[in-house]
Amino acid sequence: MQRFGFLRCRVGLVALAICFTCDAAPAWAQPYPNRPITLIVPLPPGGSNDIMARAVADKLSASLGQQVVVENRAAGGSGTVGTRQTAKSAADGYTLLLGYTSTLATGPSMHRDVGYDPRKDFAPIGLIAAAPSLLLLHPDLKIRSVSELIAMMKSADPPFQVGVPGIGTVNHLASVLFAHQAGVKVQQMPYKGSNALITDLAGGHVKVGFNPIPVSRAALESKLIVALAATSLRRSTALPDVPTVAESGLPGFDAVLSYGLLAPAGTPRPIIDTLNKDLRAALATEEVKQRLLQEGAEPMPTTPEEHAAVIDREETKWSTLIHSVGLKAE
């Protein structure tokens, strides 16, 4: 009887433990996601970054069964401030970042202390798209090739002025890379945004500039400016008749903006995989493809590992250029 009572006691304890386990399981094993997700865009509404985020947010909301809410945190620093804030968020999959080249590759070298390490503080989920910029001219120059422009720049005294939308942006560094590879001296003319540059370029106040496709399209269609070349290795689907800088005399020239989704480092891999799967599905839809192409961007579905490799490659490339030409951190 004593032995039977001991066994009954053990069975009771096991049953009690199972009950506690069942009660506790939902606290840590609830399916993801079970509440809305915040997607941080570290820049103001209306720009290319905002459009990229919203292009995929609706599709992700539908496939995940929870709302993906785009939140703009335009706190300055070319997006580095909002990026730093996201890096410090909980690694639970409920706060994501729209990361791009200027915050993940050029920002850490162009700003003295961004407060985050792109390689260590984030878990890449996948790329969304890549977008080239354009080498633009005022029509009065009557130049028809990159080689003609380089020849004019080499003979210019004082150095040729080149308009760029901001310091430390990919467009700014595209102009630096162009001068570096062409062996010419230029004077960068920074503007407070792409629209201000287009206004001055169309008015002839500056004769050459690097600018994104979407902001430049209306002035191009009105023939107020001329697209001499695209900054990607391959021609842009949005402007297939515009040659690339690489095919026009500077082999290997490549300066594009990459956009992608990231989570804070330490986010569980199953969550990363779920988000990557649904992101790739969103990029495969015709609706998202067309929306990205309107921005001059090419959809770029990748694995998390491929996304990480792009960040690493771009950071190495741009930091090497920044240091080799002696650009100073702000």
What positions do the PLM features span?
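A ligand-binding cleft/hinge motif common to bilobed small-molecule-binding domains
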Residues: T103-D113, V176-Q181, V208-V242
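Bacterial N-terminal signal peptides that target proteins for export
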Residues: M1-L13
